[in-house]
Regions:
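A short linear hydrophobic-aromatic micro-motif
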Residues: 27, 46-49, 84-89
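Short acidic/glycine-enriched loop/turn segments that link adjacent beta-strands
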Residues: 32-35, 55-57, 94-99
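Vicinal oxygen chelate
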Residues: 13, 62-110, 118-121
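N-terminal beta-strand motif that seeds the catalytic metal site of vicinal oxygen chelate
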Residues: 1-14, 44, 61, 122-162
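Short, charged/polar, Gly/Pro-enriched secondary-structure boundary elements
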Residues: 44-48, 109-110
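Short aromatic/hydrophobic contact patches that present stacked aromatics
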Residues: 5-7, 37, 60-62, 100-102
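Core segments of cupin and vicinal oxygen chelate
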Residues: 1-2, 7-46
C-alpha cells in the first residue's frame, strides 16, 4: 500500500505542531527540534514539517511505499513514461534512511518517491552540503528541487477550487 507524502516549511515549529495536531486529531509520530511528522491512517498520509529550507510553504510532494517492490513498480512506471528521474538510491534524510528517487512535474514541482528502511537519530548523514544547500528540507542536494508549491495565504479576488 502506498501513502501520500507532503513536506512543508514552517517558521514556528511548536505553533505548527499544535495546529496540525488539532487538525489531524493526533500527535506527531516523530518530533525533533527542527522537524515533526504525522503518519495518518485516514487519509493515509505522511505529513512532515520542518524549519529547514526557504520560505514557508509546501516544499515537495511524494509517494511513500510500504515495500521495496512497490518502489520498483513506481520507478518502472516513471521510466516507461519517459519521465526524467534522479535515482539517489539509499540515502539518509529527515531522520530516516530511505531508498528514493526524485521526479519533477511539468510545472516544476518536485516529487519524491521512496521506501523507508529505518529511523536515524539525525536529520541527515550525508557530507556537508554546499552553501545554500545545508538548510534544504531534503538532504539530497543534487535532487531536482523544482519550485515550491505556491499556496496563497489570503484568498485572491478570483479563486479556483478543485
Amino acid at each position: 500500500m502506498k501513502r501520500f507524502h507532503v513536506h512543508a516549511h514552517v517558521e514556528d515549529l511548536p505553533t505548527s505542531v499544535a495546529f496540525y495536531s488539532k487538525m489531524f486529531g493526533a500527535e506527531p509520530t516523530r518530533v525533533e527540534s527542527d522537524y515533526a511528522k504525522w503518519m495518518i491512517e485516514d487519509p493515509r498520509i505522511n505529513f512532515a514539517i520542518s524549519t529547514r529550507g526557504g520560505k514557508p510553504g509546501v516544499d515537495h510532494l511524494g509517494i511513500q511505499t510500504d515495500s521495496a517492490e512497490e518502489l520498483v513498480e513506481l520507478k518502472a512506471r516513471a521510466k516507461a513514461a519517459d519521465m526524467t528521474l534522479l535515482d539517489v538510491g539509499e540515502t539518509s534524510c529527515c531522520y530516516a534512511r530511505s531508498d528514493k528517487y526524485w521526479l519533477t512535474d511539468p510545472q516544476g514541482i518536485a516529487w519524491e518517491q521512496f521506501h523507508t528502511l529505518g529511523n536515524i537519530p539525525v536529520f541527515g548523514e550525508s557530507a556537508p552540503a554546499a552553501a545554500g544547500e545545508a538548510t534544504a528540507a531534503c538532504c539530497a542536494g543534487s535532487a531536482p528541487r523544482g519550485k515550491a508549491v505556491e499556496v496563497a495565504v489570503k484568498p485572491a479576488a478570483s479563486t479556483s477550487c478543485c
